[in-house]
Amino acid sequence: MKPICIIPARSGSKGLPDKNMLFLSGKPMIFHTIDAAIESGMFDKKDIFVSTDSELYREICLERGISVVMRKPELSTDQATSYDMLKDFLSDYEDNQEFVLLQVTSPLRKSWHIKEAMEYYSSHDVDNVVSFSEVEKHPSLFTTLSDEGYAIDMVGADKGYRRQDLQPLYYPNGAIFISNKETYLREKSFFTSRTYAYQMAKEFSLDVDTRDDFIHVIGHLFFDYAIREKENKVFYKEGYSRLFNREASKIILGDSKTISTSLESYHNYSQGGVTLATMLENLPNFLTANVTEAFVSIGVNDLITGYSVEEIFSNFQKLYSLLAENKIKMRLTTIAYTLFRETVNNADIEKINQWLTEFCYQNQIPLLDINRFLSKDGNLNYHLTSDGLHFTQEANDLLQSQYQLFVDEVKTL
């Protein structure tokens, strides 16, 4: 018997109206859960059910090719519980029917979380599997307040307090609930002594209940650079198309740091935020037979996006091979250090730069170490950066002159 998936989506949220359908990263929030269920590969589409009281929700959710069940009016009130809804929904199924409840308010849960949790449930003798996350703030630091406003339960709480000595505590994060009809209806709960806690990391466990929660999730998705790169594929493709110059014989391949760079006789294909990986995907589309030289300064966005150092090595090799096959001479710069940036560290940049130095030496590729001009004590100079990653105008002017000297010197060799 195949498992079924149930996604509750009542329309009457008062704290955050229509929270289940609010647009999040380009699609209704409920679609993040529907898509995760589909992509898990654990259900037939017809066995993924949205339970709702809204005809509008129904109409939109059907666009995903799944099933929608309209709730009875008495199951659509604030007083109706999840148990009430599930008891009614499961009434026509066999007692051994396995089901998965996915709450819309956990939009960061991934398809592989669902798959892993279901595989554990199927292969172990447990009553239920429920997703849990570690508590960030330990309850030993929680307190009630007296009528006068005193923290009466906290007396001496900081004496010898060491977070690392406290036993980790976990809470159900609301993302995944797995059981079967007989067990759940008998216990009227997903929590028994035989409920297995499927652990999920904090970054996947955000729960949307209030507007602040929703803004938090928006911020999380905005700063998920891997998702951003995927979503921006078309944007970058169109950008290269707009920049296309069939007559260009010398080109600049870079990111936001070289957008303003102007080298004599060079056409600039730089785009802000682009990775070496994305640039490589698009390069054949604008690499004409006229191109003879390429000035390349790129790579830090690959680290920010989450590419490994080894993947970046490989992509630089692919770039060199592609240019060499087309008899295009390559001029390269190192990657500039950063300063106090959470998304990238200079140890990785140094590894890549050391590799580039050796690679360029072996293949006789001219290499300009821009950190000679920009760094201080192994970091990007504070006075030459606007945000720890990008350059000030002073730094751009300095690099402009150094880049021109570099290509001019190479020209005379």
From Swiss-Prot:
What are the alphabetically sorted keywords of the record?
Capsule biogenesis/degradation, Cytoplasm, Exopolysaccharide synthesis, Magnesium, Manganese, Nucleotidyltransferase, Transferase
Q: Which InterPro entries match?
A: CMP-NeuNAc_synthase, Cytidylyl_trans, Nucleotide-diphossugar_trans, SGNH_hydro, SGNH_hydro_sf
Which reaction(s) does its UniProt entry say it catalyses? Answer: an N-acylneuraminate + CTP = a CMP-N-acyl-beta-neuraminate + diphosphate
Q: Which is one Pfam family of this protein?
A: Lipase_GDSL_2
Taking the first listed entry, what is the main subcellular location of this protein, grouped into a coarse class? cytoplasm
Question: Where does the protein end up?
Answer: Cytoplasm
Q: Does the keyword Nucleotidyltransferase apply?
A: yes
The UniProt entry, under SUPFAM superfamilies, shows: Nucleotide-diphospho-sugar transferases (SSF53448), SGNH hydrolase (SSF52266)
Q: Which GO terms describe its cellular component?
A: cytoplasm
Query: EC number(s) on record?
Result: 2.7.7.43
Q: GO MF terms on file?
A: N-acylneuraminate cytidylyltransferase activity
Superkingdom of origin: Bacteria
Tell me, which GO biological process terms does this entry list? polysaccharide biosynthetic process
Q: Which cofactor does it need?
A: Mg(2+); Mn(2+)
- What is known about what this protein does? Catalyzes the formation of CMP-N-acetylneuraminic acid (CMP-NeuNAc), which is essential for the formation of the capsule.
Q: Which family does it belong to?
A: Belongs to the CMP-NeuNAc synthase family.
Name of this protein: N-acylneuraminate cytidylyltransferase
Q: Which organism is it from?
A: Streptococcus agalactiae serotype V (strain ATCC BAA-611 / 2603 V/R)
> Gene name on record?
neuA
